[in-house]
């Protein structure tokens, strides 16, 4: 039997009694955000909305975005990436489990020097798939010219944020390239590999 979303006690400032709120609501108040599924328009919009709202509330507190995602849609991913660059607080990105495809794109989009992978995390990069719309097969056809533009956009971001030469990134994106946490660090996708001594990160 599913247990639903766990609830935890939380006392709002000025309140005497704690109220039970769902755990994600509580974590969001601490600027802890989660991408733990395929990236689609819904989850992208939720994360964008949270970042914008919480930035209005307090522009000085950093975000911590935990990523365990097989990837997803390119356009929602680019929208989330752009929002991460737009909001005033720094966005720490933390890979736990897998950051593949657009998941790795979001990972590399964290504030430089504040991107981390857990020791046993995996990262995968590749070129964008041939369809980026959420639609029935055949309803939309991605023209080769548009796909090329998207690939150039993603490649340019990886080059800028990893410090790797264009030819290296382009070659890596020709196929699925899986990286360990330390390999992702060597590639410039993350800056740190976490260990047991980093429990006070957040």
Swiss-Prot record:
Gene Ontology molecular function terms on file: ATP-dependent peptidase activity; ATPase binding; serine-type endopeptidase activity
Keywords: Chloroplast, Hydrolase, Plastid, Protease, Serine protease
Enzyme class, broadest EC rank: hydrolase
Location in or out of the cell: Plastid, Chloroplast stroma
Name of this chain's protein: ATP-dependent Clp protease proteolytic subunit
Main localization category: plastid
Entry-linked SUPFAM superfamilies: ClpP/crotonase
HAMAP family listed in its UniProt record: ClpP
Active site: 101, 126
Top-level taxon of origin: Eukaryota
Subunit structure comment from the entry: Component of the chloroplastic Clp protease core complex.
Pfam families xrefs: CLP_protease
GO cellular component: chloroplast stroma; endopeptidase Clp complex
GO biological process, any: protein quality control for misfolded or incompletely synthesized proteins
């Amino acid at each position: 039997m599913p247990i639903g979303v766990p609830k935890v006690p939380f006392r709002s400032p000025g309140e005497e009694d704690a109220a039970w709120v769902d755990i994600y609501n509580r974590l969001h108040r601490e600027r802890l955000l989660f991408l733990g599924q395929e990236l689609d328009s819904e989850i992208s919009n939720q994360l964008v909305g949270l970042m914008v709202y919480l930035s209005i509330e307090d522009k000085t507190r950093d975000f911590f975005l935990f990523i365990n995602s097989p990837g997803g849609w390119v356009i929602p991913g680019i929208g989330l990436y752009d929002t991460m660059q737009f909001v005033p607080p720094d966005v720490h990105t933390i890979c736990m489990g897998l950051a593949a495809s657009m998941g790795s794109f979001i990972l590399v989009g964290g504030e430089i020097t504040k991107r981390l992978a857990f020791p046993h995390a995996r990262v995968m990069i590749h070129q964008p798939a041939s369809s980026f719309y959420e639609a029935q097969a055949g309803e939309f056809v991605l023209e080769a010219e548009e796909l090329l533009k998207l690939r150039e956009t993603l490649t340019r971001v990886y080059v800028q944020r990893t410090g790797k030469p264009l030819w290296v990134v382009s070659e890596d994106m020709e196929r699925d390239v899986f990286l360990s946490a330390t390999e992702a660090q060597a590639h410039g996708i993350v800056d740190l590999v976490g260990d047991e001594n980093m429990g006070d990160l957040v």
